[in-house]
Protein backbone atom coordinates (compact mmCIF):
# COMPACT_ATOMS: atom_id res chain seq x y z
CA UNK A 1 0.00 0.00 0.00
CA UNK A 2 2.81 2.39 0.91
CA UNK A 3 4.59 1.48 -2.32
CA UNK A 4 1.47 2.33 -4.33
CA UNK A 5 1.12 5.69 -2.55
CA UNK A 6 4.80 6.39 -3.16
CA UNK A 7 4.44 5.66 -6.88
CA UNK A 8 1.29 7.79 -7.06
CA UNK A 9 3.05 10.75 -5.45
CA UNK A 10 5.99 10.37 -7.81
CA UNK A 11 3.69 10.22 -10.83
CA UNK A 12 1.87 13.35 -9.67
CA UNK A 13 5.19 15.11 -9.09
CA UNK A 14 6.39 14.22 -12.59
CA UNK A 15 3.07 15.33 -14.12
CA UNK A 16 3.23 18.68 -12.32
CA UNK A 17 6.81 19.14 -13.49
CA UNK A 18 5.87 18.26 -17.06
CA UNK A 19 2.88 20.59 -17.05
CA UNK A 20 5.03 23.45 -15.75
CA UNK A 21 7.53 22.86 -18.56
CA UNK A 22 4.81 22.87 -21.21
CA UNK A 23 3.22 25.93 -19.68
CA UNK A 24 6.59 27.70 -19.65
CA UNK A 25 7.23 26.75 -23.29
CA UNK A 26 3.81 28.00 -24.38
CA UNK A 27 4.14 31.19 -22.33
CA UNK A 28 7.52 31.96 -23.89
CA UNK A 29 6.22 31.38 -27.41
CA UNK A 30 3.20 33.61 -26.77
CA UNK A 31 5.48 36.38 -25.46
CA UNK A 32 8.17 36.05 -28.15
CA UNK A 33 5.70 36.28 -31.04
CA UNK A 34 2.96 38.37 -29.39
CA UNK A 35 0.48 35.59 -30.12
CA UNK A 36 -2.27 36.61 -27.70
CA UNK A 37 -3.36 40.16 -26.87
CA UNK A 38 -5.88 41.82 -24.58
CA UNK A 39 -9.45 40.95 -25.57
CA UNK A 40 -8.52 38.24 -28.08
CA UNK A 41 -11.03 35.54 -28.88
CA UNK A 42 -8.96 32.45 -29.66
CA UNK A 43 -10.43 29.74 -31.86
CA UNK A 44 -8.70 26.56 -30.67
CA UNK A 45 -8.72 23.98 -33.46
CA UNK A 46 -9.40 20.67 -31.76
CA UNK A 47 -8.81 17.54 -33.83
CA UNK A 48 -9.15 15.02 -31.03
CA UNK A 49 -5.42 14.23 -31.09
CA UNK A 50 -2.76 14.60 -28.41
CA UNK A 51 -1.43 17.94 -29.68
CA UNK A 52 -4.69 19.86 -29.80
CA UNK A 53 -5.87 18.44 -26.46
CA UNK A 54 -2.60 19.56 -24.88
CA UNK A 55 -2.86 23.00 -26.47
CA UNK A 56 -6.37 23.52 -25.12
CA UNK A 57 -5.39 22.33 -21.63
CA UNK A 58 -2.34 24.61 -21.41
CA UNK A 59 -4.19 27.64 -22.80
CA UNK A 60 -6.98 27.10 -20.27
CA UNK A 61 -4.36 26.90 -17.55
CA UNK A 62 -2.65 30.10 -18.69
CA UNK A 63 -5.98 31.87 -19.03
CA UNK A 64 -6.48 31.65 -15.27
CA UNK A 65 -3.29 33.53 -14.41
CA UNK A 66 -2.51 35.64 -17.49
CA UNK A 67 -2.16 39.41 -16.98
CA UNK A 68 -4.52 39.94 -19.92
CA UNK A 69 -8.07 38.82 -20.64
CA UNK A 70 -8.78 36.51 -23.56
CA UNK A 71 -11.46 33.95 -24.34
CA UNK A 72 -11.32 30.49 -25.90
CA UNK A 73 -13.72 28.69 -28.21
CA UNK A 74 -12.89 25.13 -29.28
CA UNK A 75 -13.75 24.11 -32.83
CA UNK A 76 -13.77 20.61 -34.24
CA UNK A 77 -14.28 19.73 -37.89
CA UNK A 78 -16.34 16.56 -38.28
CA UNK A 79 -15.21 15.40 -41.73
CA UNK A 80 -17.65 12.50 -41.80
CA UNK A 81 -15.08 9.71 -41.80
CA UNK A 82 -16.76 6.33 -41.37
CA UNK A 83 -16.82 5.36 -37.72
CA UNK A 84 -15.90 8.82 -36.42
CA UNK A 85 -16.98 8.90 -32.73
CA UNK A 86 -18.85 12.20 -32.90
CA UNK A 87 -19.99 12.06 -29.26
CA UNK A 88 -16.51 12.12 -27.68
CA UNK A 89 -15.50 15.76 -28.13
CA UNK A 90 -18.86 17.34 -27.17
CA UNK A 91 -18.96 15.24 -24.00
CA UNK A 92 -15.36 16.13 -23.11
CA UNK A 93 -15.80 19.87 -23.75
CA UNK A 94 -19.10 20.06 -21.89
CA UNK A 95 -17.45 18.39 -18.92
CA UNK A 96 -14.75 21.08 -18.97
CA UNK A 97 -17.26 23.87 -19.45
CA UNK A 98 -15.47 25.08 -22.60
CA UNK A 99 -17.40 26.93 -25.29
CA UNK A 100 -17.26 24.90 -28.50
CA UNK A 101 -18.62 24.43 -32.00
CA UNK A 102 -18.69 21.24 -34.06
CA UNK A 103 -18.56 21.98 -37.79
CA UNK A 104 -19.93 19.18 -39.95
CA UNK A 105 -18.53 19.07 -43.49
CA UNK A 106 -18.19 15.95 -45.65
CA UNK A 107 -14.61 16.60 -46.74
CA UNK A 108 -13.97 12.86 -46.47
CA UNK A 109 -16.38 12.22 -49.35
CA UNK A 110 -14.78 14.93 -51.47
CA UNK A 111 -11.26 13.60 -50.86
CA UNK A 112 -12.23 10.00 -51.64
CA UNK A 113 -13.94 11.15 -54.83
CA UNK A 114 -11.07 13.34 -56.08
CA UNK A 115 -7.98 11.38 -54.98
CA UNK A 116 -7.22 7.97 -56.58
CA UNK A 117 -6.91 5.01 -54.22
CA UNK A 118 -3.44 4.76 -52.72
CA UNK A 119 -2.50 8.40 -53.40
CA UNK A 120 -1.74 10.89 -50.63
CA UNK A 121 -4.82 12.81 -49.50
CA UNK A 122 -3.06 15.33 -47.23
CA UNK A 123 -2.79 18.23 -49.69
CA UNK A 124 -6.44 18.35 -50.73
CA UNK A 125 -7.68 17.58 -47.23
CA UNK A 126 -5.53 20.41 -45.87
CA UNK A 127 -6.89 22.95 -48.36
CA UNK A 128 -10.48 21.97 -47.64
CA UNK A 129 -10.01 22.19 -43.89
CA UNK A 130 -8.18 25.50 -44.14
CA UNK A 131 -11.06 27.16 -45.97
CA UNK A 132 -13.62 25.78 -43.51
CA UNK A 133 -11.60 26.92 -40.50
CA UNK A 134 -11.19 30.43 -41.90
CA UNK A 135 -14.92 30.67 -42.56
CA UNK A 136 -15.74 29.39 -39.08
CA UNK A 137 -13.36 31.88 -37.46
CA UNK A 138 -15.21 34.71 -39.18
CA UNK A 139 -18.59 33.36 -38.09
CA UNK A 140 -17.43 33.08 -34.47
CA UNK A 141 -15.77 36.49 -34.40
CA UNK A 142 -12.42 34.93 -33.53
CA UNK A 143 -9.39 37.22 -33.63
CA UNK A 144 -6.82 34.39 -33.66
CA UNK A 145 -6.81 30.79 -34.90
CA UNK A 146 -4.71 28.46 -32.72
CA UNK A 147 -3.25 25.29 -34.25
CA UNK A 148 -1.56 22.45 -32.38
CA UNK A 149 1.74 22.17 -34.27
CA UNK A 150 4.74 21.69 -31.99
CA UNK A 151 8.50 22.12 -32.30
CA UNK A 152 9.01 18.76 -34.01
CA UNK A 153 6.37 19.60 -36.65
CA UNK A 154 8.19 22.85 -37.40
CA UNK A 155 11.53 21.09 -37.85
CA UNK A 156 9.94 18.38 -39.98
CA UNK A 157 8.50 21.02 -42.28
CA UNK A 158 11.91 22.68 -42.60
CA UNK A 159 13.54 19.40 -43.68
CA UNK A 160 10.64 18.51 -45.98
CA UNK A 161 11.08 21.79 -47.82
CA UNK A 162 14.87 21.39 -47.98
CA UNK A 163 14.80 17.76 -49.14
CA UNK A 164 11.84 17.91 -51.51
CA UNK A 165 11.11 21.58 -52.19
CA UNK A 166 14.57 23.06 -52.58
CA UNK A 167 13.94 25.90 -50.13
CA UNK A 168 14.62 26.75 -46.51
CA UNK A 169 11.08 27.24 -45.26
CA UNK A 170 9.66 26.05 -41.99
CA UNK A 171 6.32 26.49 -40.27
CA UNK A 172 5.98 29.95 -38.67
CA UNK A 173 4.74 30.28 -35.08
CA UNK A 174 2.53 33.17 -36.23
CA UNK A 175 1.33 34.19 -39.67
CA UNK A 176 -1.33 35.99 -41.64
CA UNK A 177 -3.70 33.61 -43.40
CA UNK A 178 -3.57 33.40 -47.19
CA UNK A 179 -6.92 35.22 -47.43
CA UNK A 180 -5.40 38.12 -45.49
CA UNK A 181 -8.17 38.12 -42.88
CA UNK A 182 -7.00 35.87 -40.06
CA UNK A 183 -3.98 35.57 -37.77
CA UNK A 184 -2.89 31.98 -37.20
CA UNK A 185 -0.84 31.11 -34.11
CA UNK A 186 0.97 27.98 -32.95
CA UNK A 187 1.27 28.18 -29.15
CA UNK A 188 3.07 24.80 -28.94
CA UNK A 189 5.92 26.02 -31.18
CA UNK A 190 8.50 25.58 -28.40
CA UNK A 191 7.08 22.29 -27.06
CA UNK A 192 8.71 18.92 -27.64
CA UNK A 193 6.56 16.14 -29.04
CA UNK A 194 7.89 13.71 -26.44
CA UNK A 195 6.59 16.00 -23.69
CA UNK A 196 3.18 16.25 -25.35
CA UNK A 197 2.98 12.46 -25.68
CA UNK A 198 3.73 11.93 -22.00
CA UNK A 199 1.34 14.70 -20.95
CA UNK A 200 -1.50 13.30 -23.06
CA UNK A 201 -0.95 9.84 -21.61
CA UNK A 202 -0.88 11.14 -18.04
CA UNK A 203 -4.04 13.21 -18.56
CA UNK A 204 -5.78 10.30 -20.34
CA UNK A 205 -7.22 12.51 -23.06
CA UNK A 206 -9.93 10.73 -25.13
CA UNK A 207 -7.79 10.48 -28.28
CA UNK A 208 -9.60 10.16 -31.61
CA UNK A 209 -7.46 8.52 -34.34
CA UNK A 210 -7.47 9.98 -37.85
CA UNK A 211 -8.57 7.21 -40.21
CA UNK A 212 -8.26 9.39 -43.29
CA UNK A 213 -4.62 10.48 -43.37
CA UNK A 214 -3.02 8.58 -40.49
CA UNK A 215 -3.54 5.20 -42.14
CA UNK A 216 -1.49 6.09 -45.21
CA UNK A 217 2.00 4.54 -44.97
CA UNK A 218 5.29 5.96 -46.26
CA UNK A 219 4.30 9.61 -46.18
CA UNK A 220 7.28 11.91 -46.71
CA UNK A 221 6.56 13.68 -43.43
CA UNK A 222 6.62 10.40 -41.54
CA UNK A 223 10.01 9.54 -43.07
CA UNK A 224 11.39 12.88 -41.87
CA UNK A 225 9.80 12.38 -38.44
CA UNK A 226 11.45 8.97 -38.08
CA UNK A 227 14.80 10.47 -39.11
CA UNK A 228 14.57 13.23 -36.49
CA UNK A 229 13.53 10.80 -33.76
CA UNK A 230 16.50 8.60 -34.60
CA UNK A 231 18.81 11.62 -34.39
CA UNK A 232 17.28 12.66 -31.07
CA UNK A 233 17.89 9.17 -29.68
CA UNK A 234 21.46 8.81 -30.96
CA UNK A 235 22.61 12.42 -30.62
CA UNK A 236 20.91 14.07 -27.62
CA UNK A 237 20.63 17.82 -28.02
CA UNK A 238 20.75 17.85 -31.82
CA UNK A 239 17.03 18.64 -32.18
CA UNK A 240 17.30 21.56 -29.74
CA UNK A 241 20.29 22.95 -31.61
CA UNK A 242 18.58 22.68 -35.00
CA UNK A 243 15.54 24.50 -33.70
CA UNK A 244 17.79 27.16 -32.21
CA UNK A 245 19.39 27.55 -35.66
CA UNK A 246 15.99 28.52 -37.07
CA UNK A 247 16.05 31.46 -34.66
CA UNK A 248 19.61 32.50 -35.56
CA UNK A 249 19.66 32.94 -39.34
CA UNK A 250 22.69 34.66 -40.91
CA UNK A 251 21.62 35.77 -44.43
CA UNK A 252 25.11 37.00 -45.34
CA UNK A 253 26.42 33.44 -45.02
CA UNK A 254 23.78 31.78 -47.16
CA UNK A 255 23.17 32.15 -50.91
CA UNK A 256 19.85 33.98 -51.23
CA UNK A 257 20.35 37.24 -53.12
CA UNK A 258 16.88 38.38 -52.05
CA UNK A 259 17.94 38.32 -48.40
CA UNK A 260 21.41 39.80 -48.75
CA UNK A 261 22.99 42.21 -51.23
CA UNK A 262 26.03 40.20 -52.34
CA UNK A 263 26.47 42.36 -55.44
CA UNK A 264 26.84 45.38 -53.20
CA UNK A 265 30.00 44.01 -51.58
CA UNK A 266 32.99 45.97 -52.87
CA UNK A 267 36.51 46.86 -51.75
CA UNK A 268 36.17 48.78 -48.53
CA UNK A 269 32.90 47.15 -47.46
CA UNK A 270 32.58 46.44 -43.74
CA UNK A 271 33.05 42.94 -42.35
CA UNK A 272 29.64 41.35 -41.75
CA UNK A 273 28.82 38.52 -39.34
CA UNK A 274 32.38 37.32 -38.86
CA UNK A 275 33.52 37.73 -42.43
CA UNK A 276 35.10 34.90 -44.46
CA UNK A 277 35.79 31.44 -43.10
CA UNK A 278 37.31 30.15 -46.33
CA UNK A 279 40.83 30.08 -44.88
CA UNK A 280 40.00 29.29 -41.25
CA UNK A 281 38.29 26.21 -39.90
CA UNK A 282 35.35 27.28 -37.75
CA UNK A 283 35.42 25.87 -34.24
CA UNK A 284 32.28 23.80 -33.67
CA UNK A 285 31.36 22.88 -30.06
CA UNK A 286 31.47 19.19 -29.22
CA UNK A 287 28.17 19.50 -27.34
CA UNK A 288 25.06 21.23 -28.72
CA UNK A 289 24.99 24.90 -27.76
CA UNK A 290 22.92 25.65 -24.67
CA UNK A 291 21.50 22.14 -24.38
CA UNK A 292 20.82 20.59 -20.99
CA UNK A 293 19.20 17.15 -20.70
CA UNK A 294 15.95 16.90 -18.79
CA UNK A 295 15.92 14.45 -15.89
CA UNK A 296 12.92 12.62 -17.31
CA UNK A 297 14.06 12.50 -20.95
CA UNK A 298 13.08 9.29 -22.69
CA UNK A 299 13.24 8.16 -26.30
CA UNK A 300 10.00 8.62 -28.21
CA UNK A 301 8.63 5.76 -30.26
CA UNK A 302 7.49 6.50 -33.81
CA UNK A 303 3.91 7.76 -33.72
CA UNK A 304 1.36 8.91 -36.24
CA UNK A 305 1.55 12.68 -36.46
CA UNK A 306 -1.48 14.58 -35.24
CA UNK A 307 -1.38 17.83 -37.20
CA UNK A 308 -3.72 20.11 -39.06
CA UNK A 309 -1.79 21.04 -42.18
CA UNK A 310 -2.08 24.82 -42.43
CA UNK A 311 1.19 26.26 -43.67
Swiss-Prot record:
EC number: 2.8.1.-
Cofactor requirement: Mg(2+); [4Fe-4S] cluster
Cofactor binding mode and count: Binds 1 [4Fe-4S] cluster per subunit. The cluster is chelated by three Cys residues, the fourth Fe has a free coordination site that may bind a sulfur atom transferred from the persulfide of IscS.
Subcellular location per the Swiss-Prot or TrEMBL entry: Cytoplasm
Keywords: 4Fe-4S, ATP-binding, Cytoplasm, Iron, Iron-sulfur, Magnesium, Metal-binding, Nucleotide-binding, RNA-binding, Transferase, tRNA processing, tRNA-binding
Pfam families: ATP_bind_3
Binding site for [4Fe-4S] cluster: 122, 125, 213
Molecular function as annotated in GO: 4 iron, 4 sulfur cluster binding; ATP binding; magnesium ion binding; sulfurtransferase activity; tRNA binding
Catalytic activity: cytidine(32) in tRNA + S-sulfanyl-L-cysteinyl-[cysteine desulfurase] + AH2 + ATP = 2-thiocytidine(32) in tRNA + L-cysteinyl-[cysteine desulfurase] + A + AMP + diphosphate + H(+)
Motif (PP-loop motif): 47-52
Biochemical pathway: tRNA modification
Enzyme class: transferase
Name used for this protein in its record: tRNA-cytidine(32) 2-sulfurtransferase
Organism: Salmonella typhi
Amino acid sequence: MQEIQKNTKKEQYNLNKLQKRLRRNVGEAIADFNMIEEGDRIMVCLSGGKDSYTMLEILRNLQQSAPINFSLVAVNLDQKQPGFPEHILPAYLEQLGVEYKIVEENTYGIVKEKIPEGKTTCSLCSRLRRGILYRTATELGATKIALGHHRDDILQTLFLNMFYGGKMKGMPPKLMSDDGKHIVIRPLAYCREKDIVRFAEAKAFPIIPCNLCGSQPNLQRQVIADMLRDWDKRYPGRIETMFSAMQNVVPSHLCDTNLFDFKGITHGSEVIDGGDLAFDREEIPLQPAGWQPEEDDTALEALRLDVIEVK
